[in-house]
């Protein structure tokens, strides 16, 4: 079987977690890498989309991609952009979406809402139970990066733009909690609920502090830890992945490396104090009151 086949590349909920958690940057990056081998340079033989609406209804313009050749695949924040000779398609996994790379003989399931079949009879299929995902078509000549929803996004966490000086300048004007600031896609993309809690723990910064109270030295810690933790999660296959399996059979399970997220009322791995939780901006925050005092 060709090396690009994945037994079933999925982004799912982890049963250990308390509450819902959507795929974050590492999980989307792992997904992108998983589909690249099947799609990069491939001819798109056919397109399918269901008549169910996702976050917005899928356009029949997606069928324009039939007969196109895929020229580029990339990630921007939590979006996957697939560029072809006949336009582009932007995919967001939403809360429960996952992409699978499958043989053409695999039948569709109830919640399979979009698929591309290549000239090699390989299917890249989107399954989305809760239908909070997104599949958008951009015509030839459109620049997706200058259009919604990509145009107002902040810098990538691994980009040259995302520096301690940049973060310090942005936080000086931020009257929200530092946790909410890190989750603001206009400040930096891809740091979702799980990783914001973990980054602040690693940086020994209380999530209850205001963004404008963060010192420049602390910004250095935050930037370094965002990059370190996201990189580690990508290497391990992500956090919200329950059963990711690559072609080599290796599993990704960064959930085992989480220090605070999902561990409320459990002892801190560093000091033994019970982890606390609170709600900030309708999302649950986890922290150690001693280590992050």
Q: How should these model regions be labeled?
A:
Residues 6-9:
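Short hydrophobic targeting helices and cationic amphipathic motifs
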Residues 43-61, 74, 166, 170-293:
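Basic, nucleic-acid-binding surfaces and adjacent catalytic neighborhoods in DNA/RNA-processing proteins
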């Amino acid at each position: 079987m060709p090396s690009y086949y994945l037994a079933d590349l999925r982004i799912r909920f982890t049963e250990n977690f308390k509450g819902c958690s959507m795929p974050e940057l590492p999980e989307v990056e792992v997904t992108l890498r998983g589909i690249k081998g099947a799609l990069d340079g491939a001819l798109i033989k056919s397109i399918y989309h269901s008549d169910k609406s996702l976050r917005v209804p899928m356009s029949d313009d997606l069928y324009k991609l039939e007969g196109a050749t895929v020229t580029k695949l990339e990630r921007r924040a939590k979006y996957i952009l697939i560029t072809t000779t006949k336009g582009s398609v932007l995919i967001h996994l939403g809360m429960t979406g996952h992409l699978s790379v499958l043989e053409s003989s695999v039948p569709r399931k109830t919640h399979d809402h979009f698929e591309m079949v290549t000239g090699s009879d390989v299917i890249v299929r989107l399954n989305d139970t809760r239908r909070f995902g997104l599949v958008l078509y951009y015509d030839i000549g459109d620049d997706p990066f200058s259009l919604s929803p990509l145009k107002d996004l902040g810098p990538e966490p691994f980009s040259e733009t995302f520096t301690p000086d940049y973060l310090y300048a942005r936080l000086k004007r931020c009257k929200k909690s530092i946790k909410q600031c890190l989750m603001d896609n206009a400040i930096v993309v891809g740091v979702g609920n799980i990783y914001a809690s973990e980054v602040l723990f690693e940086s020994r910064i209380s999530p209850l502090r205001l963004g404008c109270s963060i010192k420049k030295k602390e910004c250095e810690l935050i930037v370094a830890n965002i990059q370190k933790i996201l990189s580690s999660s990508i290497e391990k296959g992500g956090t919200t992945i329950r059963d990711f399996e690559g072609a080599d059979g290796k599993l990704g399970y960064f959930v085992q490396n989480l220090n605070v997220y999902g561990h409320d009322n459990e002892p801190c791995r560093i000091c033994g104090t019970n982890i606390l939780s609170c709600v900030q901006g309708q999302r649950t925050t986890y922290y150690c009151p001693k280590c992050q005092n």
